[in-house]
Amino acid sequence: MAFAWWPCLILALLSSLAASGFPRSPFRLLGKRSLPEGVANGIEVYSTKINSKVTSRFAHNVVTMRAVNRADTAKEVSFDVELPKTAFITNFTLTIDGVTYPGNVKEKEVAKKQYEKAVSQGKTAGLVKASGRKLEKFTVSVNVAAGSKVTFELTYEELLKRHKGKYEMYLKVQPKQLVKHFEIEVDIFEPQGISMLDAEASFITNDLLGSALTKSFSGKKGHVSFKPSLDQQRSCPTCTDSLLNGDFTITYDVNRESPGNVQIVNGYFVHFFAPQGLPVVPKNVAFVIDISGSMAGRKLEQTKEALLRILEDMQEEDYLNFILFSGDVSTWKEHLVQATPENLQEARTFVKSMEDKGMTNINDGLLRGISMLNKAREEHRIPERSTSIVIMLTDGDANVGESRPEKIQENVRNAIGGKFPLYNLGFGNNLNYNFLENMALENHGFARRIYEDSDADLQLQGFYEEVANPLLTGVEMEYPENAILDLTQNTYQHFYDGSEIVVAGRLVDEDMNSFKADVKGHGATNDLTFTEEVDMKEMEKALQERDYIFGNYIERLWAYLTIEQLLEKRKNAHGEEKENLTARALDLSLKYHFVTPLTSMVVTKPEDNEDERAIADKPGEDAEATPVSPAMSYLTSYQPPQNPYYYVDGDPHFIIQIPEKDDALCFNIDEAPGTVLRLIQDAVTGLTVNGQITGDKRGSPDSKTRKTYFGKLGIANAQMDFQVEVTTEKITLWNRAVPSTFSWLDTVTVTQDGLSMMINRKNMVVSFGDGVTFVVVLHQVWKKHPVHRDFLGFYVVDSHRMSAQTHGLLGQFFQPFDFKVSDIRPGSDPTKPDATLVVKNHQLIVTRGSQKDYRKDASIGTKVVCWFVHNNGEGLIDGVHTDYIVPNLF
């Protein structure tokens, strides 16, 4: 029975030991001073290399160890590697005296009999088993003749998950003896560009940090190298044992100029999604805590310490309650309460007073917490735009009340009804972790084991930090209909800050011209739609550097993700559904050479006219390219209405187009940089638009030579408590004083009652209901241009719902007005005639000219002919232009 609880991945090398009868003892690689440098027990491990290539978060790792038997008799050599639990082994090869024995992945049941036969014959074997919190240990032993060399090579792959804002790759370094050539080489390629890269080790010294470890990144490429010399490996200047014993961790993140990134290679696509700058969605948390007798002592104290830290991180918009279970169930409050300073102080007192007692009634504890969240929603005790979660901590199995795991699972599933996630934390090893994991998975959460160490409280706090900041709920990833096959999971209950959603799939037609991905979700203040478009021809150009990366990495990433998700679904499936999931996961595991819980790695080594094999199983917890350039086409659904059309663009040129006259008027405003002008104000609808002037890089005080533009715009609706500040770098939306920040490179739609805001690269469209639509255009110039800088254009394409009281430099023209142009005559410039304009009881001299309408094309624009009114529009605008200067943007 003990074996059944031992989660192990087995690799057995089925080869007999030397006929000389040399005793089979495990190889320990412990050095002695009397032996030659780098030799232990007659074996010299002269090379250990870890080579990793990471392409778009997908890591391909090769661990190679080379050894020679310096003794005059046969010796046994062991190869130990610790690899992440989330990784899949893809190959293992053994080379003895130049002859290579390759690995082959087979269905586990096919290989099982061969393995059992080998064990019964007493042949050498190795294990891969759980090793610590994040790793599994792979071990294989082989008998090596005197003077012979052996090479072990293990390959594994994994998708690096984003965790608290960065990707992490763990490598265990433990050579156990001095190694002549020891090195770790990691090459990272990210088409989005690398924003940070770091590497550190638990055993690092100043000497190693200064010369043995190098790390660098530039653009899309990053590199980490660790090559300690023999002397640098010594634990002391005269020692022969190695100080290289611990964790080697690489962390990095990528540039996120837009929330999503789509990559397509050979008919497969991957979509990475991680928006930034969004406000946190308020959360309602039911903490369901086990206080049974087994939690007594250090475990309960650590739980209290963690909960006290978590209370420090609660936001005032959050709601919470504590549900304690032992033989019975008790609660801190009858209902969820808001995390006000007063309530949090009372909660701290309650947490400190928790005492252990009695049995373990998991069923009733969970159902009480779930019921509390459901009632809070039904009785409108919590904000409408908030999200609920259940966090349960237990250290044992249910032993009172309903104790059947399958029945508890059913009760919890029915009570939650798919409305919110359940996160289960298993404290220690004396519990049914599979039960906790399965229950969490089928309720859109996950399970974590909390290890009984001195840092258990930090483990608990670390988990909470992962789910503390939901930015979106109800996330749906949508792709072209009938254009994709074999899509991985594309709906998620939450997107948490610092994480990333990854979706992959296969294209029906590889010859598509473009590919579009939409992501919809509910934010803290409004609903959002993010759009990512990829031009396939541009994508093809972007892959010209693909020799830098390994193989069809997107196809393998898709296979990895698909297998991982099929295996998760399989845990809670039954009957025919489970058989189908198993068959699909097995087929993919065999096709892509992954060692999963359904397959085994077999290494064939002919010996004594027999096929000798090595078998590896996968345990569970309980047992170079250029950036993608999406198409920048403007949302053409916004066409100019037949109504008058108004805009300001350029230096700054105000243009009033009057369709009835088949003509247009225009004027400039010359003011100093920093001046804020009132463009639109409507007291009835509550709409206001202001613009701040920015100057060119020369900073000339002479208005005749100075170029000025609008560098910042403020759009506000007082009735909706809505504000949006638009600059050339970003767009910040305040909805009821809660900010959301977007980049101009985002493709996103924000919707709520009476409001729609769409950002599509160089354009932003804001609509207030049916009848008010503004467009903001971003003009970008070469960053190193000696004079010009980026600026904004503002266009009113629909204003028929604005009131008759609307005013401002543009707003005053929203109501019908008449003008007459006469006496057209040659001007000072032969190409620009003058004329007489009669408007608003003024007779003005105007000049024929032309401006550009950039609403559809920010680069080229469309020519617009207009009559230019001189002197800051004097006579055309009401009053003088200085009447429209306001103190600030809002």
UniProtKB/Swiss-Prot annotation:
Entry GO terms, CC: extracellular exosome; extracellular region; platelet dense granule lumen
Keyword ATP-binding found: no
InterPro entries referenced in this protein's UniProt entry, alphabetically: ITI_HC_C, ITIH, VIT, VWF_A, vWFA_dom_sf
Post-translational modification: Heavy chains are linked to bikunin via chondroitin 4-sulfate esterified to the alpha-carboxyl of the C-terminal aspartate after propeptide cleavage.
SUPFAM superfamilies noted in UniProt: vWA-like
Keywords: Glycoprotein, Protease inhibitor, Proteoglycan, Secreted, Serine protease inhibitor, Signal
Subcellular location field: Secreted
SMART domains, per database record: VIT, VWA
Leader peptide range in chain numbering: 1-20
Chief subcellular location: secreted
PROSITE patterns, alphabetized: VIT, VWFA
One of the record's GO molecular function terms: serine-type endopeptidase inhibitor activity
Residues the record lists as Aspartate 1-(chondroitin 4-sulfate)-ester modifications: D651
Subunit architecture: I-alpha-I plasma protease inhibitors are assembled from one or two heavy chains (HC) and one light chain, bikunin. Pre-alpha-inhibitor (P-alpha-I) is composed of ITIH3/HC3 and bikunin.
Record family assignment: Belongs to the ITIH family.
Summary of the function given for this chain in its UniProt record: May act as a carrier of hyaluronan in serum or as a binding protein between hyaluronan and other matrix protein, including those on cell surfaces in tissues to regulate the localization, synthesis and degradation of hyaluronan which are essential to cells undergoing biological processes.
Protein name as annotated: Inter-alpha-trypsin inhibitor heavy chain H3
Gene: ITIH3
